[in-house]
Amino acid sequence: MMVIRPVERSDVSALMQLASKTGGGLTSLPANEATLSARIERAIKTWQGELPKSEQGYVFVLEDSETGTVAGICAIEVAVGLNDPWYNYRVGTLVHASKELNVYNALPTLFLSNDHTGSSELCTLFLDPDWRKEGNGYLLSKSRFMFMAAFRDKFNDKVVAEMRGVIDEHGYSPFWQSLGKRFFSMDFSRADFLCGTGQKAFIAELMPKHPIYTHFLSQEAQDVIGQVHPQTAPARAVLEKEGFRYRNYIDIFDGGPTLECDIDRVRAIRKSRLVEVAEGQPAQGDFPACLVANENYHHFRVVLARTDPATERLILTAEQLDALKCHAGDRVRLVRLCAEEKTA
């Protein structure tokens, strides 16, 4: 059975394996053992209440409970930009006009922005390609909403998610090649690695501070502004069905879109509810797949189960209860996947 759980120190080798499969561009999952170990340690200290809000971040893994195989990772940053500035570009417009010459030009322009400072961030979502089946992607991505719903007071009112932009299999980014490389004088992969390993001072030192007309970029770079990597398109669709929207903010490195939503308007958070759980044989029928999560902060678990999402008493098997670290009579959080999201 596939189950979401908090990351543990022993997961570092599994995370290294996942990082080696990303193909680049996933800044927060670098193939660097020291960085990943530090990330795990920070997550553990977050759960233990040892860090200020500006440093808090939760990391979860998707595990096969039968074999112990770690198949994916996802994370939440509690409040971005409170220690190091959190940059993106806002895609706006500057108008140049002359009545005398009868000229009017509205020019798309990139403005350096820290507008999302303090927002909670969904990040580090990666599912091993071999496990992209049977609803695992939905479980991995949406499990974070179950955690946020259960422990709402630990998160801020706005949630953002940076989507990976267009990068080819060789690490070539049209947006970086046309813009970032001119200021940073390094390849995309190098900048991505430095950022992912916490060496972010160079961003503030070398970033262009003035607005940039997108018409000055190559056509190839203009075409990928706000577009996602093909492998990231499903993740974007999942978030958009939950209420996230692109509001004209993009990543400073690859031009990928930043999606955002008010936390209390996220579908899975808004519609999830607590029900009592009992042990038994679930009723047969064509029921939809639902997320089921316990309410245990330190031993949080989420699984997928087919059940009636309107039930007041959820029947689960002994195996499902064990995976959730629950007992009969406990209360669990329940919400169905979106109607069009299939798990088979």
UniProtKB/Swiss-Prot annotation:
Chemical reaction(s) catalysed: succinyl-CoA + L-arginine = N(2)-succinyl-L-arginine + CoA + H(+)
Name this polypeptide is given: Arginine N-succinyltransferase
Stored SUPFAM superfamilies: Acyl-CoA N-acyltransferases (Nat) (SSF55729)
Coiled coil: none
One Pfam family, short name: AstA
The species this protein was found in: Escherichia coli (strain 55989 / EAEC)
Residues that, per the record, bind succinyl-CoA: L125
InterPro entries for this protein: Acyl_CoA_acyltransferase, Arg_succinylTrfase_AstA/AruG, Arginine_N-succinylTrfase
NCBIfam families given in the database record: arg_catab_AOST, arg_catab_AstA, PRK10456.1
